[in-house]
Amino acid sequence: MSNDSSKAKQNQVDEAVEGEIITDNENETVTGEASLMDELTQANFRVEELEQALEAATAKVDEQKDSVIRAAAEVDNIRRRAAIDVEKARKFALEKFANELLPVIDNMERALQGTDAEAEATKAVYEGVELTLKSFIGTVEKFGLTVVNPQGETFNPEHHQAIGMQPSPDFPANTVMMVMQKGYILNERLLRPAMVMVSQGGAAVDTQA
């Protein structure tokens, strides 16, 4: 009887010990899981911080890239505007210079018109003025100056200025029958219109063009 009682007590002790072991194991498991979760949480926070830092760095790089692109575009614009300004200044200076030369050309042409090319007394003068005029015209043409001499051409109000109209059996209507003063174009821009007399008939001509 005493043996049975001893066995029963021993069993109770064993069960109590096993219960404590199980409890300790469960506590260790819970503690381990909590520690693992804490490590995972910290790792997630770290990943988020790194992602935010990466996004900030990427945004900074994009911003700097945009700044560089804008700066390069602005430099190109400045260069383009400077080139345009230089070209305008060059054309303006050339136009002003050409305008000063036109009266000289007109005077030489009038001198030729008023000089007898066949007379012995004036032949040498005529040839000298003619040669000078041709050389002068050839020089200014190198800089883009073009003579507008529309004798026999259809009246063009963009390049010609009609000073009058006359009936003529020798010219169709609206044809330049006489050039009173030559015109000039500088680099495709009208410097001075040609002063012309236009044949009468057909469509009317705007003499104020």
From Swiss-Prot:
InterPro entries membership: GrpE, GrpE_coiled_coil, GrpE_head
Pfam families: GrpE
Domain of life: Bacteria
Keyword Metal-binding annotated: no
Example GO BP: protein folding
Keywords: Chaperone, Cytoplasm, Stress response
Sequence segments annotated as region (Disordered): 1-27
Predominant cellular place of this UniProt entry's protein: cytoplasm
Biased amino acid composition, Acidic residues: 15-27
Gene3D superfamilies: 3.90.20.20, Head domain of nucleotide exchange factor GrpE
Signal peptide bounds: none
GO molecular function, one term: protein homodimerization activity
A Gene Ontology cellular-component term: cytosol
Localization (cell): Cytoplasm
PANTHER family from the UniProt entry: GRPE PROTEIN, GRPE PROTEIN HOMOLOG, MITOCHONDRIAL
HAMAP family given in the database record: GrpE (MF_01151)
Functional summary from the UniProt entry: Participates actively in the response to hyperosmotic and heat shock by preventing the aggregation of stress-denatured proteins, in association with DnaK and GrpE. It is the nucleotide exchange factor for DnaK and may function as a thermosensor. Unfolded proteins bind initially to DnaJ; upon interaction with the DnaJ-bound protein, DnaK hydrolyzes its bound ATP, resulting in the formation of a stable complex. GrpE releases ADP from DnaK; ATP binding to DnaK triggers the release of the substrate protein, thus completing the reaction cycle.
NCBIfam families: PRK14139.1, PRK14140.1, PRK14150.1
Protein name in UniProt: Protein GrpE
Organism name: Shewanella sediminis (strain HAW-EB3)
Classification of source organism: Bacteria, Pseudomonadati, Pseudomonadota, Gammaproteobacteria, Alteromonadales
